[in-house]
Amino acid sequence: MALDAAQPGFATRAEALRLRSWKLGAGQPMQVIDQFAEAGFTHIVDDRADVHIGSRDGRFYLGYFPNGRPGGVDEDWVTGEGWVIAVTGTAIVPGYRMSFGTETPAEIIAGVVAQILATSQPL
């Protein structure tokens, strides 16, 4: 393929791009929250209507922040962060944390949560 340096950008045919439709928009957060109906999780809705869900052993946390997550002492807001999922590790294996924007489709978060819950086992 020859490159024409005189032309800025690139050119291609629409067929070559193989355009797709992608899931967009926040969706319904209850698709995520409803997965925690069993008694092994605590639910808290705070005064900002943020939802906090945790496992009774304290190792799993899910936070839903429809208007963005509030920041720490040095920051006003962590803008755009709508979902936080964290699993605390052990003395041997580290845990993990992930966050998603306020406009991440709830269906995608629900899929991630379902996978995490499927891997957890009572001791």
Can you describe what each PLM-predicted range is?
Residues 2-59:
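Negatively charged, low-complexity tracts enriched in Asp/Glu with abundant Ser/Thr
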Residues 45, 49, 54, 64-66, ...:
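Generic detector of ordered, mature protein regions
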Residues 2-4, 93-123:
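Intrinsically disordered, low-complexity regulatory regions enriched in serine/threonine/proline
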Residues 60-107:
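Intrinsically disordered, low-complexity regulatory segments enriched in Ser/Thr/Pro
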Residues 33, 44, 53, 85, ...:
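Weak global preference for isoleucine
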